[in-house]
Amino acid sequence: MMLRTCKDVTMRGERVVVRVDFNVPMRDGMVQDDTRVTAAVPTLRYIIEQGPRHVVLISHLGDPTRDADKAEGNAKKDGCPFDRHAFINGKHRLKPVADCLAKKLGVPVHFAPSCVGQREFIEGLPDGSVVLLENVRFHPEETSGDAKVQEQFARELAQYGDIFVNDAFGTAHREHASTVVLPRLMRRRVAGLLIEREVRYLEPMVCNPKVPMVAVVGGAKVSSKIAVLESLLRTSTALIIGGGMAYTFLKAQGVGVGTSLVEDDFIDTARMLLQKAQSGGVSVVLPVDHVCASTFCADAQPVAVDDVHIPMHLMGMDVGPRTLEQYRAHLKGVSSVLWNGPVGVFEFDAFAHGTRVLAQLIAEATDAGATSVVGGGDSIAAVSKFGLASRMSHVSTGGGASLKLFEGKVLPGISCLET
């Protein structure tokens, strides 16, 4: 898909609305990880340099009502007091993000205390001003399932501009007012530089990758990755399956997995996927040895198991050295690598070795000329933890959105933009 971007429209003197993804982790009113803020800077800097009348930024930050309800329920269960107002102020207000963005852009970022009713405030600012509106999800209309309610809310937002730029890849799979309805009400609707880059790297991986291609799919559950696996079986030369989901596949082959995480309801699904792979000539790489533990905790004693079968009293926590050698063999000389999900409990240092070596092998393949794409929150956290993000061709900013693309799905927040 060739998208029109912010570089394809004239912005001088225009009112520009940008949907960004500033859904960042917050603690006590402080930004804990500014990766998504940093990712938006190239697009915003480019737009500012074009001399627009103003730039209005729209974002969400968590889901205030749902998050507060959950936290309040947990507090009641534990018999603890709960201050709903303080909770929302500490985790869902975008003012700290405006301050963070101002430092990165090197220009003032004005903050509007609401996302509606701000036209007079915005138009009273000097030309070229940048304004961040308050959390769009403070208004339930944003996520309403009622099309008329969403459109009415989107019309409120449409008053702020003539050109819509979507640079919020992380929400592109959501059919929300600010991502899908709003752009249809604007004179021009184009992609930001971040979305353009995401589509440029991710779409070929699932539609027409350079071969040989190796897909690495990990994480805890088969149930959350069925559509991804089915999609990748159509394009991959080899499929490496690791993490907790690997034990469901091993059990489907009659392998003993001890007390490892298994989704018994999906064993037949795992068998079906293995049969599809065999019919399609796709090599499936499952663990042949393991690093195990008797309990699931950070200080558990690692136990090496040099066999595909796991003893009854142990659970798999990471892959072993023979499995890593198989990874090395399959990744040597590849043209494309897609990685979604860790192959072990990398959050625990004692069980991080497999995921660390995998990341290193993918980095080496990239150095040798392969195109590598990393998508999914845990994989992104892993390459960042091991200091290897800069050696990947592309590290996606979208968890759910990248997963939907890997499934071969159309993203509504992108399909509504100009091509």
Curated annotation (Swiss-Prot):
Transmembrane feature ranges: none
Family annotation (Gene3D superfamilies): Phosphoglycerate kinase, N-terminal domain
EC number(s) per entry: 2.7.2.3
Protein name, UniProt field: Phosphoglycerate kinase
Catalytic activity: (2R)-3-phosphoglycerate + ATP = (2R)-3-phospho-glyceroyl phosphate + ADP
Record-linked SUPFAM superfamilies: Phosphoglycerate kinase
Sorted UniProt keywords: ATP-binding, Cytoplasm, Glycolysis, Kinase, Nucleotide-binding, Transferase
Subunit structure: Monomer.
Pathway: Carbohydrate degradation; glycolysis; pyruvate from D-glyceraldehyde 3-phosphate: step 2/5
Residues given in the record as substrate binding sites: D21, F22, N23, R36, H60, L61, G62, D63, R137, R174
The keyword Nucleotide-binding appears for this protein: yes
CDD domains: Phosphoglycerate_kinase (cd00318)
BP GO terms, sorted: gluconeogenesis; glycolytic process
One Gene Ontology CC term in the entry: cytosol
Compartment list: Cytoplasm
Leader peptide range in chain numbering: none
GO molecular function, one term: phosphoglycerate kinase activity
Major subcellular site: cytoplasm
